[in-house]
Each structure stands twice: as C-alpha cells, then as structure tokens.
Amino acid sequence: MASSQGKSELRYADWMSSLPDTLHGIPLTNLAIPGSHDSFSFYIDEASPVGPEQPETVQNFVSVFGTVAKKLMRKWLATQTMNFTSQLEAGIRFFDLRISTKPRDPDNELYFAHGLFSATVREGLEQISTFLASHAREVVFLDFNHFYGVQNLHHEKLVQMLRTVFGDRLCPVVFAQEVSLKYLWEKEYQVLVFYHNPMALEVPFLWPGQMMPAPWANTTDPEKLILFLQASVKDRRRKGTFFVSQVVLTPKASTVMKGVTSGLRETITERALPSMMQWIRSQRPGESGVNIITADFVELGEFISAVITLNYYLDDEEENAT
C-alpha cells in the first residue's frame, strides 16, 4: 500500500477500481468497506434549532443557555470533521444518514440532522454526485436510517431528489450476493440506497433497511464494544445481507458532564483508538467476516487504509486457491 499520506489519498480516491482483478467478481457483501458514522455531522450548524428528536431536557437546556449550550452540544454531536467530498477522496464509501425537517418550515426542506441541523440533503447528495462523475468505477452506499418529522410528502420529495441527482447510476434492488464491482461496472451503477422506511417497498432503487443491518453496542467501554463487535460478526453469517460493524463508542450523560467542554473526540474516541484499531486490523472480510466498518473521525489512526487493506487478504486467498 502507498506509504506517504499524499500517495494514500490519491490511491484511496479510486481504491475500488484499484483492487486486484481477482476481487472484481466477489460480492460486495464479502469486501471490507470503510464508512463514516453520522457522516454529515461535519456541518452541524450551531445557529440552527434543536432537532425534533431531542428530549425535553435538552430543549430546555438550550432555551436557557442558548448559543453556549449549542456550542457544547456540537462538541459531542459532531462525529466527523471532513465534508462528503473529503471523505470520498480519502476512501469512505458508506454514509450513515439521518434526515429531518425543520419545524414550521414553509419550504418543507430536508436536512441532515443529529441533535442540531446540518447541511441540506440536496447539498450533500450533489457533493457525492460530483465525486462519482469523475470517479466512474467507485461505488457508494447511502444508508437513510433515521427520519425525524418526515411525512409522506417529504419521502416523495427525497425519492425524486435521488432520481434527479443520481439518475441511471442508482442500482435497483437485486439479491445482495449478485452485487459485485464487475456487475455494477457493466451496468454503470454507482449508488446503492438503503431506506429504513416502508417507502422502500414502493421504489425499485430503494433497498430495504433490513438488507443493511447495523447493530449498535451503545457503550462507552472499549472492551465491551470489542466483545459486541466480535459476537455480531459471528451472528452475521446467518443474514446473507450487507452488514455494518459500528466501531463507535456512545457517551452516557455522565460522560458528557465529565468532559463537557472537551467533547467526544478528546474524551472518548482518541483514548479508545488503539484498541479499536487493533480489532479492525485483526479482522478478515468474506462471507463470515466483516463487511462495512464505520467509525467516528475517520481520519484518525489510519482507519480508512486499515479497512481497505483487509481486502488484500482476500486476494491472497483467491490466488492460493487457483
């Protein structure tokens, strides 16, 4: 693999097309693919209202302390520092997306949201589309897994937006095991959209959410996280779908209070990074192995290169089998 940071970025902007020929026909369910957790949170807006999914205690906290409260919230809610374009160029191919409307918005605009509102959905999708236009053999997974204040008319608007932005690059639903890089390249598909809402049953290019399970450890303890990840990967072989391993720690209220001014990255992510990276490097992709791996602050600890490198173990296996 490329040794310098600059070479790494160049390599990983087209890492899928750079994989060995022996991996082009392997189902994408069997490859190791780096993804980002709360992918849009690089652009959480402190000037925005609090998201509708937040509990009353948070709403009251913000109403009393205003901008100061939102600045502190951002330190814990923003899990990424790179925008979509930078993530794509660095090698990220899976995006964890949460959609919300703003209260009393006459335009019915759709936003990415996690506690506070982020960029508009259209802005984000257009960034992704621009990247794909100049990287024709790269493929992305868009996982729309939370919807806040989203009614049927908003779902219809989002579906139309996806059609407009991506057009013929949207891959219709087929058996997950059929989807390889070779299959997608031949048909010129670049986008798989997973949609955790019954609307997925009505639209040919919306893959049902159950085809992208992403079990969540919900712990601040790195050891418990690793045990959970290991158990969920073992359980994965019974599903026959894509699969997300969320290598992320979730702060409790007490954790936030202890490190309220330092934030998620400094208080939790950086401290746990060595053990999380050790687990990733010990994994192998394949039918019973890891598939999509997501993290907070994906630029840390050579996370992206570590995940992509796992695919080269598959190549060694393929060569040894021939």
Swiss-Prot record:
UniProt xrefs under Pfam families: PI-PLC-X (PF00388)
UniProt keyword list: Hydrolase, Lipid degradation, Lipid metabolism, Transducer
Cystine crosslinks: none
PROSITE patterns xref list: PIPLC_X_DOMAIN (PS50007)
Keyword check for Lipid metabolism: yes
GO MF: phosphoric diester hydrolase activity
Annotated PI-PLC X-box domain residues: 22-197
SMART domains membership: PLCXc
GO BP field: lipid catabolic process; signal transduction
Catalytic center residues: 37, 114
Keyword Lipid metabolism found: yes
Any one Gene Ontology cellular component term annotated for this protein: synapse
Descriptive protein name: PI-PLC X domain-containing protein 3
Gene behind the chain: plcxd3
